[in-house]
Amino acid sequence: MSNRILLVEDDPINVKFIQTVLIKKGGFEVIVSEEVDEILRVAQGGDLAAIIMDVSLSRSSYEGKKVDGIFITQLLKKDPATRSIPVLLATAHAMFGDREKYLELTGAEGYLAKPIHDPALLIEAVKAVVKS
């Protein structure tokens, strides 16, 4: 099984924290991108254990339109080549009912509220979707 994680995140502080935890505590290899074409190319290339997807991306665009992590996850789940890759949504939008709404809307396998302060919780969430 692959140990590669695609991290789709636009906040440099979150990228550094998540990437460091995944590498040092989880033993994962981490690829970071917020460019939709690169995300799709990496995902279609296979060999990913999971994708961690920020829901609110500020700089991502697809076919000339600004898009968020919800849209990108929907693209991935519609594509037969990428639909089986587990997606863990990561979002600061952690209001009551958001988890269920986002999971249903995207078909993602997991949800993690940000900010993430507990490395063990992050590793546990990633391992849970990898096993799903």
Q: What name fits each language-model region?
A:
Residues 9:
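Conserved acidic carboxylate
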Residues 12-37:
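Two-component/phosphorelay signaling modules centered on CheY-like receiver
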Residues 47, 81-86:
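His-Asp phosphorelay/catalytic-motif detector in bacterial-type signaling
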Residues 63-67, 71, 94-112, 120-124:
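Alpha4 helix (beta4-alpha4-beta5 surface) of REC/receiver domains from two-component response regulators
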